[in-house]
Amino acid sequence: MIFYFSRTGNTRWVASEIAKAIGEELLYIPDLIRQGQYAFTLKEGERLGFCFPTHGWQPPRIVRDFIRRLCITKADDAYCWALTTCGDNMGVAMTILNKELATIGLKAETTF
């Protein structure tokens, strides 16, 4: 399961290629917010990914707000990862992301 946000399409392309390569479902964060969908269940062996552009050296507000409302039911060994696209420097985007994820009991084990 990959949650993504993209304004220009760059991150959408990256997230789509990763989803195809690893066989994961791709979910667009703005659509989920419009639908009021925040509860998800990870299947056994399913990974959880987040893809987003870096805005001002951090994840976009829409991503942070979505994570605060997110409710994930998962296996104890569920693997979480995150990828950010950026022009030159991701700043503290992943540190901020992991602080948000910690509020719902998750941590991105690998970040790109």
How should each PLM-predicted stretch be described?
Residues M1-F112:
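FMN-binding flavodoxin-like domain, especially the glycine-rich phosphate-binding loop
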